Design a protein with these regions (language model features):
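Hydrophobic/aromatic beta-strand patches that form the interior of the parallel beta-sheet core
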Residues: 13-15, 27, 108
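Active-site beta-loop-alpha junctions enriched in small/polar residues
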Residues: 32-34, 91-92, 112-119
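Histidine-rich, glycine-flanked metal-binding segment
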Residues: 1-23
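Residue-level detector of flexible, active-site-proximal loop/helix-junction positions
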Residues: 21, 44, 114
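Short N-terminal targeting/anchoring amphipathic segment
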Residues: 16, 28-30, 85-87
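Alpha-helical scaffold segments that flank or form the walls of functional sites
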Residues: 39-105
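Metal-coordinating catalytic core of metallo-dependent amide/deamination hydrolases
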Residues: 97-131
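Histidine-centered catalytic micro-motifs
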Residues: 25-36
Length: 131
């Protein structure tokens, strides 16, 4: 094998990748990690009907803690599939960022904005104007 690439590197550990493919981590540009909590709840429906049912479930169980736990699950699944960076949008984005940090992932995230009341009854105007 050709080791010239690594001659001037100060690696703590050298791993032989002979016979394998080495590639950078993938980037998931559309992620709702904590939605992993609702997998299998509603399937094969048009988007509007699917959202209507999922939002009822979200309103019933989502808290900062359950969002964190769902994010850990969803982000771990991303890591296992090769994604090391995600762009996530979900309720309680601070909890999703904490989950990503705890797992060693890179993340970009933001809140949810639309013209319907969300978790906790907050409207778009409430989000724009601040806490």
């Amino acid at each position: 094998s050709d080791t010239r690439v690594a001659e001037n590197l100060n690696a703590k550990k050298i791993v032989s990748a002979n016979g394998n493919i080495v590639m950078p981590g993938l980037i998931n540009m559309h992620c709702h990690a904590a939605d992993s909590l609702f997998r299998g709840l509603v399937e094969n429906l048009p988007l509007e009907e699917w959202l209507g049912r999922v939002w009822i479930a979200e309103k019933a169980i989502l808290t900062p803690e359950t969002t964190y736990l769902g994010s850990v699950l969803g982000l771990a699944e991303n890591l296992l599939s090769g994604s090391t960076t995600v762009m996530d949008m979900f309720w309680y984005p601070d909890e999703t960022v904490k989950a990503a940090k705890d797992l060693g992932m890179r993340i970009s995230t933001g809140g949810i904005f639309f013209d319907l009341p969300g978790i906790g009854g907050r409207s778009h105007e409430n989000y724009v104007s601040g806490p």
